[in-house]
Amino acid sequence: DQSRGLGDVYKRQNLKRSKYKYMPFQKLKIRNKNEIVTLRTKFADPTKISGKKVKYNEWNQLIKDKDTIVIDVRNEFEVKIGSFEGAINPKTKSFTDFKSFVQKKLNKSKDKKIAMFCTGGIRCEKASSYMMMKGFKNVAQLDGGILKYLEKTPKKDSMWNGECFVFDGRVS
């Protein structure tokens, strides 16, 4: 198990474990970075503020609400292979582009209900923090991301369409 002992190093991190028939990574490298996902702004600090975490079993009800703006926070190439019904594709090439999408397309929606999701939840922590620090009032994020939703939600109840890209080349 490559992650053994990491809990001691990164106590505040919620390590996600998955079982696979093969080793998805040949080696493990740990580095401290200024930003785990790069947004390049001082207006995003999930340790101070972030969106309300919505559990997988409450997600469908939230995104079915016609007054909710549902945003896929992932990059365009990820969105193209799968997403939730009715989700907005911000058409970003990299996560840094998300700021521009918010300013150009959502700035007049600060009082609307926002529901966002990403692969495992990390980008949503940052994106929801950014939006709240920019004045959005009602921001929610899918707790554990798409991967947790797909793991826990029965197929018959799932509102997910397509595949979910994972950065080591797998799809879920």
Each model region followed by its residue ranges:
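Helix-loop module immediately N-terminal to the HCX5R catalytic loop
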Residues: 57-64, 68, 85-114, 156
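A short secondary-structure junction signal
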Residues: 41-42, 80-85, 99-102, 126-130
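Cysteine-dependent PTP/DSP-like catalytic domain, specifically the C-terminal lobe
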Residues: 100-111, 126-172
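Hydrophobic/small residue at the entry helix of a nucleotide-binding pocket
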Residues: 123
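Flexible, polar/low-complexity N-terminal or interdomain linker segments that lie immediately upstream
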Residues: 11-69, 74-82, 168-172
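Short, surface-exposed ligand- or partner-binding patches at beta-edge/loop junctions that are enriched
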Residues: 117
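Single conserved hydrophobic/aromatic residue that forms the stacking wall/gate
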Residues: 1-10
